[in-house]
Amino acid sequence: MEIVINNISGLNNSFNNNNNSNNNDENEINFNLIKESIVNFKLWDINNKQIEYVCRLGSGSLCRVYKGRLNGKPVAIKVFSPIRFEEFKTEFLMMQSLRSSPFLISFYGVSIVEEPQKQCYCIITEFCSRDSLYHIMTDRLIEIGWNRFFQFSMQIILGLQSLHNRKPKPIVHRDVTSLNILVNEDWECKISNFSASRFNCLNTEYINSNNQNKSFAFCSPESSDFQDIDDDYTSLSSSITSKSDIYSFGIIMFELISRIINGEYSHPFSEFKDIKNDFQLLLSSKNGLRPSLPNICPEPLEKLYKQCVDQSPLNRPSCEEVIISLNQIRSFYLLPQTKKSWDNLVLKNKCK
């Protein structure tokens, strides 16, 4: 039985002590000005009275996430504090510009909610009941075989293709991780979390160097081509392109293949015990280190994985090329002798 909480401050009155300490006059924003300044905001503005907050699902450095209902329909609600206005604005501008795709999280609208002594911004999207791909892979009770691998991989790359082929400006996600791939009741993968995304990404971009939301294991080598500007920001190299997303997709391939063959989840780069922090991880990646697939990994999958995580972005395949390769590998897998051989790799883990 679901318990509806009409006042979300009753769940958690603040994001954290740091947010409270920063909740000063300069962070108090006139919300009427916000609605006027953000393109298309009014078209997507949802009256908060239409939204019911059911339960809190989790929280991160950027926002809190709730399960809720919009006019009786299950939804996910991301609540950003005032100091996270830029992240909210970026994600809204990205999501309202996306064309419809079955493998991108559906965007329903935005809302403004009042909490004690502050107002917060909300993004409302479809609710995915199976949580993230990461949570599915870490649950040993869920069986994942090669059919699921091809299903998940194809859905993710099709979602990326719809971003990279967007007209007139393509979108580079820049934070493709298994945590940002949500899975609905029908086992369909949905790319989510567009707060780090950018149009084109051909010019220099700026990111917060203290952003704890970034998953460094999925960062391409060119992502570490930065130089300090000041204490708060770094300048990213213009080399971050759609091929950086392909690298991240390759790391998700590693996660899935390792989970299938080993029977349990392996964090990317966890095999390298000398890597103690994110800086070492980024430096190691830049120097060519990659997570190692199990030595019994089928050769066609290993080849595609290595192409996706190639040191040079120019050598990585496009989404279209990955789709062709996945279809070819799946056809090869479905050959009776191949299927028997590959499926035996999974059966060995069940006997462990």
Curated annotation (Swiss-Prot):
ATP binds at residues 57-65, 78. It holds the Pfam family PK_Tyr_Ser-Thr. Residues 51-333 form the Protein kinase domain. The active site is at 175 (proton acceptor). GO terms for biological process: signal transduction. Signal peptide: none annotated. GO terms for cellular component: cytoplasm. One of its GO terms (molecular function) is non-membrane spanning protein tyrosine kinase activity. Keywords: ATP-binding, Kinase, Nucleotide-binding, Transferase, Tyrosine-protein kinase. It is an enzyme of class 2 (transferase). It catalyses: L-tyrosyl-[protein] + ATP = O-phospho-L-tyrosyl-[protein] + ADP + H(+). Disulfide bonds: none annotated. The keyword Kinase applies. Its EC number is 2.7.10.2. Gene3D superfamilies: Phosphorylase Kinase, domain 1 (3.30.200.20), Transferase(Phosphotransferase) domain 1 (1.10.510.10). Belongs to the protein kinase superfamily. TKL Tyr protein kinase family. This is Probable tyrosine-protein kinase DDB_G0290471. It comes from Dictyostelium discoideum (Social amoeba).
